């Protein structure tokens, strides 16, 4: 759900980084935050759990542009990867506009990747969303490590029909992080433009987006 602020003529689209525990979701956001000029991003807020983290911050890339007269801001979230935080994951997914699924390329992580992707589909269905109708890209992370799955193996497991864009990455050193962000931003903004051009009535006004509870 896109949030509109008519006072500042800004709107915010929500992008969620999803995937199994320790796959690199948090690392992606730290790299983006650290390499983006302070004038082009908001403050990063970390809602920590005992074994994992959920992160959130506003981001205003220079090249997002203006849509329908609104300056567009992207809100980037991660979700906790541990199974017992599934309720939190569903809360974070509410109102999502685009998803980056971060897969861990290490060979022993094949089944956890598949299970996490199934979990994504199930959680979206529970909140009335269809994964096939949302902008979604895959990031195959940790390509710099040994004993990793091939891209073909990852696609066979997560992208068998080849319909999803995917990006190879090594988030720990920044490789592929911004390419992934650019990919999901492009799809999300394209969907947003299409949605706005098809709506005849004025959208609901929200003063500001709320940070999800852990």
Label every PLM stretch briefly.
Residues 85-108:
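Inter-motif core of Ras-like GTPase G domains
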Residues 108-130:
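Amphipathic helical hotspot of TIR/SEFIR-family domains
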Residues 202-214:
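Low-complexity, Pro/Ser/Thr/Gly/Ala-rich intrinsically disordered linkers and tails that serve as
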Residues 22, 82-83, 106-108, 142-146, ...:
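Conserved nucleotide-binding/hydrolysis micro-motifs of P-loop NTPases
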Residues 44-84:
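Switch I (G2) and immediately adjacent beta-strands of P-loop GTPase domains
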Residues 98-101, 125-142, 160-168:
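Conserved beta-strand/loop subsegment of P-loop NTPase cores
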Residues 137, 144-197:
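Canonical P-loop GTPase G-domain recognition
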Residues 2-49:
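Conserved G1/Walker A P-loop phosphate-binding module
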């Amino acid at each position: 759900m896109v949030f509109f602020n008519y006072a500042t003529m800004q709107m915010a689209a929500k992008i969620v980084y999803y995937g199994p525990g320790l796959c690199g979701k948090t690392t992606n956001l730290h790299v983006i935050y650290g390499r983006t000029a302070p004038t082009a991003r908001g403050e990063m807020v970390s809602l920590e759990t005992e074994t994992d983290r959920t992160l959130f911050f506003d981001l205003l890339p220079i090249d997002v542009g203006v849509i329908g007269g609104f300056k567009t801001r992207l809100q980037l979230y991660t979700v906790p990867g541990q199974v017992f935080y599934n309720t939190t994951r569903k809360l974070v997914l509410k109102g999502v506009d685009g998803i980056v699924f971060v897969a861990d390329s290490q060979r022993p992580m094949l089944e956890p990747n598949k299970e996490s992707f199934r979990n994504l589909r199930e959680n979206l269905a529970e909140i009335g969303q269809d994964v096939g109708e949302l902008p979604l890209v895959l990031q195959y992370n940790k390509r710099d490590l040994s004993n990793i799955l091939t891209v073909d193996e990852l696609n066979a497991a997560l992208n068998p029909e080849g319909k999803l864009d995917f990006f190879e990455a090594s988030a720990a050193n920044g490789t592929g992080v911004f390419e992934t962000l650019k990919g999901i931003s492009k799809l999300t903004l394209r969907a947003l433009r299409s949605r706005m051009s098809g709506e005849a009535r004025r959208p609901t006004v929200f003063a500001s987006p709320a940070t999800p509870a852990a």
